[in-house]
Amino acid sequence: MKTFDFKPKMVSAIRNYNKQTFMADMMAGLIVGIVALPLAIAFGIASGVSPEKGIITAIVAGFVISAMGGSKVQIGGPTGAFIVIVAGIINQYGMQGLTIATLMAGVFLIGFGLLHLGTIIKYIPYPIIVGFTSGIAVTIFTTQVKDLLGMQMESVPSDFIEKWIVYGQNLMNIDPWSAGVGLVSVAIIASAPKFSKRIPGSLIAIIVMTVAVLLLKQYAGVTSIETIGDRFSISSQLPDATVPELTWETIKGLVAPALTIAILGAIESLLSATVADGVIGDHHNSNTELIGQGVANIVSPIFGGIPATGAIARTMTNINNGGRTPIAGIVHAVVLLLIFLFLMPLAQYIPMACLAGVLVVVSYGMSGWRSFTALMRNPKSDITVLLLTFFLTIIFDLTVAIEVGIVCACLLFMRRMSETTDVKAVYDEIDLNEDTDMERGNLEHLSIPKGVEVYEINGPYFFGAGNKFEDLMGRYGNRPKVRIIRMRKVPFIDSTGMHNLENMCLMSQKEGITVVLSGVNEKVEAVLRRNNFHKLLGEENICNHIDLALARANELVA
């Protein structure tokens, strides 16, 4: 029986905690907090909520994920992966619908952890992950074109194709000043790593372009550059905790979006934790991480936040700056809280074009175009799943993409697994070289008596194997008296295989054919006995070795 698996890394991290580690965590937390600020604002606005909700998410979820998660260095908060799904939920269900969906996603994540699904989630097929991640990146870029170029247009359609049609129709409405701010911001962020490894390019771009826009407005009379303050009213007041009203109809309608948030959050957080493990030489606890993520996504919306998960970029920033325990993540949350309380009003001066530039760079990083092009050289089945997930993400939505992608991957997996099982007929004699289910090693071959058919199954006996078996039996011309089925290389049998084997035995008995099993291992034999196979065939027709099975066949045909 599986035990309850909730062991936050915070508990083990503080056992041997010392001043040197604390100072390293403090410095890392301070830097990560500063790095997280522009991203939290940008992700919040891009998701369709106010900028302070993005910061509140980073504060609340960041604290909980560090305190209760299964990774020592994971930094949590809003991420680009959620932009598409969050914006879609808000458009369809409103802010209250998003709050309920996030709460439900938190419950799902806790359930994943309690059911020990942490390891399984990491094995979601790579083409699906690349497909929807690349699709999200393209969608994020598409949503930022208007602000990046300062297009003077009243509204932007929600449909992907319609967006680009409208953009094409409004090329003459580009504001050159806003476009300049957006493109220069992209250039600053892209070139910043060459000059500074510690200070993030997004922060440099926001500071430089905010000051530049203030100067342009003050001394050059430029008023066309839109800022956060032009679109939102900024508040630095912490919201009260509120629980939304839940109805059964609302819950039913939000199951699919909530499950998408949970799956997406689980994948991203566990990928981030795995990458971090490789850098610091540690091993995260996947199930504890999922439970911590779940609690964070329950607490965050209660305080007005949006979905959160582990963020790879912020986690790596934490590691690169010396963070080695969850204390660094908690410090990062405290730094963001102080900025929120005392400096939030200054955010109103940040240009929207600059934030769009930040998200354009984020979308480029998410696109994974190298992985995408590499997968295009893989088998056609992988390419099909990749392209299907990608196009469903950008044309429809992420919920549909993940659902269809996983179904397709499961079908392909079933087909590939069925191909691993080989069923063959042995016609004249049995080669005992390197055999494992015979007693008389001094014989090299055993002859098959007349009136006896011998079949050998190599691999798991489940879906697919049964059909191969039936097709192969149909090729024999004469009806035998005995059918021997060698199962020495069958590691397990599932309910489908059991059903097929039982039907084959019943049909054989109706035709007057005796079925003899040979070389059944303990695990498979236990399944057969639970299904009363020894009564169906008779104990004497279940043999440990092929030579015993042939001896039994000789008795039956004599």
Q: Which residues fall in each region the model found?
A:
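Short acidic-hydrophobic, aromatic-tinged amphipathic segments that line or gate anion-handling sites
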Residues: 536-552
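Transmembrane helical cores of multi-pass ion-transport proteins
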Residues: 1-427, 431-432
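Short secondary-structure capping/turn micro-motifs that flank functional sites
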Residues: 334, 524-525, 544
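Short, contiguous clusters of charged residues that form electrostatic/catalytic patches at enzyme active sites
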Residues: 28, 186, 190, 467, ...
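Active-site-adjacent beta-strand anchor residues
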Residues: 76, 131, 517-518, 543
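Generic hydrophobic alpha-helical segments
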Residues: 86, 167, 469-473, 549, ...
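The feature marks cytosolic C-terminal regulatory regions of anion transporters and related permeases
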Residues: 365-536, 554-557
